[in-house]
């Protein structure tokens, strides 16, 4: 690349300058933040709750642990972790988008979840936390929106304690042809219409469908985690691989 030539990346199916993607993604989530929880229930038929519940179970969170819920949005995982780690533990809900953070903070405070939760606006590619700080890091439905996923994974590895665990819950690739066809039809024909009806924003849900297709598949993401320094990396497919939970450790 010649001097002065900017790097490019994808925003859905569009090719954009890498330094512009974060602002474009921010626009999506500023637009949908207020109706984010409702839309999650509608577009997944409530199944996202099962995916998140399984993630919590796999985390092994215990009293006294420090947990980073990265790209934590409206706080579904944070609420569960807050209960599990107790008063001697700590949960940090971090998100790059201030609109999502505001919704999450309001929701959790309205539910009385205040004593062990803090909120940080942070970029996953350069986390503002000390080395070896967290016992558990989760990033649920956030990694595909990150511009430099390799940098983000390395940053997560840095702030994770030795013996700590990273859990990446993300949309992935269906394993069977029939499911792929049904999923494509739903994603590109139905989902944007739902977005328009509920959030008055079809474009953001077109981006969602496209961003899922551009995200690395299960085995590629597994190798990316290994390359970032994680060990014993594996994954579990859910709903035929529409979603996968990747797990890796720092030793």
Swiss-Prot record:
InterPro entries: SAM-dependent_MTases_sf, UbiE/COQ5_MeTrFase, UbiE/COQ5_MeTrFase_CS. One of its GO terms (molecular function) is demethylmenaquinone methyltransferase activity. It catalyses: a 2-demethylmenaquinol + S-adenosyl-L-methionine = a menaquinol + S-adenosyl-L-homocysteine + H(+); a 2-methoxy-6-(all-trans-polyprenyl)benzene-1,4-diol + S-adenosyl-L-methionine = a 5-methoxy-2-methyl-3-(all-trans-polyprenyl)benzene-1,4-diol + S-adenosyl-L-homocysteine + H(+). Its EC number is 2.1.1.163, 2.1.1.201. One of its GO terms (biological process) is methylation. Keywords: Menaquinone biosynthesis, Methyltransferase, S-adenosyl-L-methionine, Transferase, Ubiquinone biosynthesis. The keyword Transmembrane helix does not apply. PROSITE patterns: SAM_MT_UBIE, UBIE_1, UBIE_2. Pathway: Quinol/quinone metabolism; menaquinone biosynthesis; menaquinol from 1,4-dihydroxy-2-naphthoate: step 2/2; Cofactor biosynthesis; ubiquinone biosynthesis. S-adenosyl-L-methionine binds at residues 74, 95, 123-124. It comes from the Bacteria. It holds the Pfam family Ubie_methyltran. Methyltransferase required for the conversion of demethylmenaquinol (DMKH2) to menaquinol (MKH2) and the conversion of 2-polyprenyl-6-methoxy-1,4-benzoquinol (DDMQH2) to 2-polyprenyl-3-methyl-6-methoxy-1,4-benzoquinol (DMQH2). Belongs to the class I-like SAM-binding methyltransferase superfamily. MenG/UbiE family. This is Ubiquinone/menaquinone biosynthesis C-methyltransferase UbiE. It comes from Shewanella oneidensis (strain ATCC 700550 / JCM 31522 / CIP 106686 / LMG 19005 / NCIMB 14063 / MR-1). The lineage of its organism: Bacteria, Pseudomonadati, Pseudomonadota, Gammaproteobacteria, Alteromonadales. The gene is ubiE.
């Amino acid at each position: 690349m010649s001097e002065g030539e900017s790097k490019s990346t994808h925003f859905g199916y569009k090719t954009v300058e890498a330094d512009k993607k974060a602002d474009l993604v921010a626009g999506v989530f500023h637009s949908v933040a207020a109706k984010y929880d409702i839309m999650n229930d509608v577009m997944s038929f409530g199944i996202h709750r099962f995916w998140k519940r399984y993630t919590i179970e796999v985390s092994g969170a215990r009293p006294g642990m420090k947990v980073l819920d990265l790209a934590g949005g409206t706080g579904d995982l944070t609420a569960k972790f807050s209960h599990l780690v107790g008063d001697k533990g700590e949960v940090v809900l971090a998100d790059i988008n201030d609109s999502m953070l505001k919704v999450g903070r309001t929701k959790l405070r309205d539910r009385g979840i205040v004593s062990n939760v803090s909120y940080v606006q942070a970029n996953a590619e350069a986390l503002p936390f000390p080395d070896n700080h967290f016992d558990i890091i989760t990033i649920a439905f956030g990694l595909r929106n990150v511009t430099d996923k390799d940098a983000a994974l390395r940053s997560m590895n840095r702030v994770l304690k030795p013996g700590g665990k990273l859990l990446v819950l993300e949309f992935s690739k269906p394993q069977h042809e029939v499911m792929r066809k049904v999923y494509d039809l739903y994603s590109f024909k139905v989902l944007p219409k739902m977005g328009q009806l509920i959030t008055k924003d079809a474009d953001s849900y077109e981006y969602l469908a496209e961003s899922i297709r551009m995200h690395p598949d299960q085995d590629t993401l597994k190798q990316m985690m290994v390359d970032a320094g994680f060990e014993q990396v594996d994954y579990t497919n859910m709903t035929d691989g529409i979603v996968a939970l990747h797990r890796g450790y720092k030793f």
